């Protein structure tokens, strides 16, 4: 009978000094293990090993290329400034209204959930989602509309986001992101009448398509919450079909749309679906794409129209919205006339005084724009606050 202190004969102890103290972990094996995991993703998923950068770099030891891009997006000052840029309300005073920063975090979260459900590349979705709005102006789309009218050649925040990550960040070096991420950032925007158009996304990666639809869905979810919280609209004002289909609570709306997109886009997994598809596709006409069911898509499209008519457009047309537009216009004209006030490095990178003025104003937060406007034209910024505490 073996005593409680006996050691089984098959267990052997080695003196510590017989174990090599010079053995070092192979950190590159971490990246290889992560890349190997990507091989189990959908055959339609983007793989980090296939990514390219404008300037080739040695691989990181513990991260895939898309994970590196995600990390690069969150460190620049342009990302940090998003916390003080408007989503809808102009310079909101309440603590809980959505900012541009919380918006991109929600887009990344919704996108990752969809990508996980479809066995696509979550890291790529997250990198695009976090970086897609880096180029937004102060006061949201109000500021964007002003610069689009005043700048030769127009202005769009998605193009400016690409300009930031490829040129303006890091004193002209840019972030050197992969083409997958840059393409997703460039093509995330959705014209008001083309929310669920297949033709608009057929040349995008599935991960970029996920961010595109997640951006719109996150908009609706948190903007409805903000509109209700501020009493700008009442729950009973919302289209009845939308409330019945999506639910009354924020969490219900988010869960409903994520589940519907995953179910409707199941062919993106490459798995056998309920109709018997074997996951193989011939030609562009049968290429899988990210979508909603026709029924819920119609409801969401109608809800989006409602939000434009009852929330977004009225905000832009409000006294505060008009003042915000006037501030952006004033600052652009001011710095275009006096380019010597713009940081020298930015002027050098921008290529022209007009472009430098747009780049400078676009980089401002709401509060900084208000402060600068007060210096240029005292009193102009008075009353430019929306949202209830």
Please annotate each region the language model reported.
Residues 126-131, 213-214:
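Short alpha-helix carrying the canonical HExxH Zn2+-binding catalytic motif
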